[in-house]
Swiss-Prot record:
Keyword Membrane found: no
Gene: coaX
Binding site for ATP: 7-14, 121
Job of this protein: Catalyzes the phosphorylation of pantothenate (Pan), the first step in CoA biosynthesis.
Matching CDD domains: ASKHA_NBD_PanK-III
GO CC annotation, single: cytoplasm
Cofactor note: A monovalent cation. Ammonium or potassium.
Annotated binding of substrate, by residue: 91, 98-101, 171
The protein's annotated pathway: Cofactor biosynthesis; coenzyme A biosynthesis; CoA from (R)-pantothenate: step 1/5
Subcellular localization(s) per the UniProt record: Cytoplasm
The name this protein goes by in its record: Type III pantothenate kinase
Organism: Xylella fastidiosa (strain Temecula1 / ATCC 700964)
Gene3D superfamilies registered for this protein in UniProt: 3.30.420.40
Length: 242
């Protein structure tokens, strides 16, 4: 039986098989709320060991864990540590560094100096030097969350729709341009500062469910949609040898 990797985020739930260190095709599962659909949970794969990375609400994580413990012989939950597989986290209290960010750094180690950007509910930015030292990062709202926040405070502002323009001439376009533009500007500023700090070239890596709307405006960027799962596979290999 295969081992399986599970990436449970705030709005997306993905999994992939893991066999002899090789990750299989990624499956996007129905996102499970606190009122979970029991049938959907029963459709989760079965295997030997399940490796779970979760930044979801505790109630959601608990529900998923309960089912995984039935479907698998063993379940291991990834957690951030100060140092792992060549990567050293900058936080004085590593447990406060999100496990998704931690795993994304593990997945990108070995690719030189990298600026790792995750676009989901939040927009996260982390700088990893080629020697494995994490040099810190930023957290902001993603463009999607920005629009949700604006709509929540001013219902007349549409939640979706519009096209990116540098100077928009209607509200929907202006919202897309402002929210996406804010994200692009923060990424570009961070990339500039990364170059200044390291005085070397820095690759820009993007992952997460919200990257599609930003990719056209970021120039030389590497899209790594399964970066967290890549990191989880590395974490799993370390855990298996402990």
């Amino acid at each position: 039986m295969n081992d399986w990797l599970f990436d449970l985020g705030n709005s997306r739930f993905k999994c992939a098989s893991l066999r002899e260190g090789v990750i299989g095709p990624v499956t996007v599962l129905p996102y499970l709320t606190e009122t979970m659909d029991a049938f959907a949970l029963q459709e989760l794969p079965r295997g030997r060991v399940a490796y779970l990375a979760s930044v979801a609400a505790p109630a959601i994580t608990t529900h998923v864990l309960e089912v995984l413990k039935i479907h698998f012989e063993k379940v291991q939950v990834a957690a951030t540590v100060a140092a792992c597989a060549g990567v050293r986290i900058a936080y004085a209290h590593p447990e406060r560094f999100g496990v998704d960010r931690f795993l994304a750094l593990l997945g990108s180690y070995g690719e030189g100096n990298v600026l790792v950007v995750g676009v989901g509910t939040a927009l996260t930015i982390d700088l990893l030097a080629a020697n494995g030292c994490h040099l810190g990062g930023r957290i902001s709202a993603s463009p999607t969350l920005m629009r949700q926040a604006l709509h929540a405070r001013a219902e007349q502002l549409p939640l979706s729709g519009g096209n990116y323009l540098e100077f928009a001439e209607d509200t929907e376009d202006a919202l897309v341009s402002g929210c996406n533009g804010a994200a692009v500007a923060l990424i570009e500023r961070s990339l500039y500062e990364a170059h200044q700090r390291l005085d070397q070239s820095v690759r820009l890596l993007l992952h997460g469910g919200g990257v599609a709307s930003l990719l056209p405006w970021l120039g030389d960027v590497v899209h790594r949609p399964k970066l967290v799962l890549d990191g989880l596979a590395i974490w799993a290999a370390v855990a298996a040898n402990v």
